[in-house]
């Protein structure tokens, strides 16, 4: 089993290297190992196909969050020949796999999830949030470059992150975990001004369908103000 994320939001919104994913796929094929993607964050955020539509297809994918339409949910999906081992009409007992629980297949959650998929399929959600994500990254990058400030904005789709370093490319957590005290001061300033982003060590966030361009403009204004705080 190899569990990874193709576009790991929890790793500072730095996409996994394509050659790394390709090498993982080749290794798993060679050894008979299942390649599993953790798409609890990226699944349905980067597209209905998740991040697996960007790079290398996994054998299994773990999903959560938005697929429940705001209600608690978790899901596993994957290749038919792998998933059919959960079918007890074909494989009796617990010979291969057992799955069950008090909330498995909760009808209210599944109905909310289907309604969410319908909205994602028939509304310009992905175009809108990707546009805002690109806008946020480009505007913040311009601010940093114009001020010759050692920081960069990265991400994909609607995801964005701020890293207080000029080092490129970012490949390891040590590349962007910098002065924590400085990061906390800037994080707190943004929070005090209504900008909620995740953890000062890796300041990252995401645009939603409810956000507008004016919200991104406000974000970048706050970032421009915070860059000078030490």
Predicted regions and their residues:
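Conserved N-terminal phosphate-binding loop of PLP-dependent enzymes in the Aspartate aminotransferase
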Residues: 1-230
